[in-house]
From Swiss-Prot:
Residues the record lists as N-acetylserine modifications: S2
Sites where the protein binds heme b: H89
Role: Involved in oxygen transport from gills to the various peripheral tissues.
UniProt-recorded name of the protein: Hemoglobin anodic subunit alpha
Tissue specificity annotation: Red blood cells.
Lineage summary: Eukaryota, Metazoa, Chordata, Craniata, Vertebrata
One GO location term (cellular component): blood microparticle
InterPro entries for the chain: Globin (IPR000971), Globin-like_sf (IPR009050), Globin/Proto (IPR012292), Hemoglobin_a-typ (IPR002338), Hemoglobin_oxygen_transport (IPR050056)
Length: 143
């Protein structure tokens, strides 16, 4: 599913609201994923604590949202922007790409909870399409 110019504009505009709370949203989304989908903890076995409020979860969640923010800023070149990260996840970390969809879903849940009045059906559609494309781009090196 490709992103239209309107979708890109909606995502970029909405990201301006998300950006000031990105660290908090990232930590909450990653913590939620680890709790609701405990099988994802296997990728973080080297952490001492994978509970939702642990410093490791919060720090990595913030890093994830910072990366997504970078992708939003260069949304037209998503696959190129995510190339090295796709290599890392495919060849070194060996993360099952199905987990990217799970994380995207959890990020959308937290965004919706954080901005209930702003997460309109139009925004939901565009953000969902963005995360579908993000997942495909991050999975590019798996092919």
């Amino acid at each position: 599913m490709s992103l239209s110019a309107k979708d890109m504009a909606v995502v970029k505009g909405f990201w301006n609201k998300i950006a000031p709370k990105a660290d908090e949203i990232g930590g909450e989304a990653l913590g939620r994923m680890l709790r609701v989908f405990p099988q994802t903890k296997a990728y973080f076995a080297h952490w001492k604590d994978t509970s939702p409020n642990s410093p490791e979860v919060k720090k990595h969640g913030a890093l994830i949202l910072a990366t997504i923010g970078d992708v939003v800023n260069r949304i037209e070149n998503m696959t190129t922007v995510l190339g090295s990260l796709s290599d890392l996840h495919a060849f070194k970390l060996r993360v099952d790409p199905a987990n990217f969809k799970i994380l995207g879903h959890n990020i959308m849940v937290v965004i919706c909870m954080t901005f209930p009045n702003d997460f309109t059906p139009e925004v939901h559609l565009s953000v969902d399409k963005f995360f579908q494309n993000f997942t495909l781009a991050l999975s590019e090196r798996y092919r």
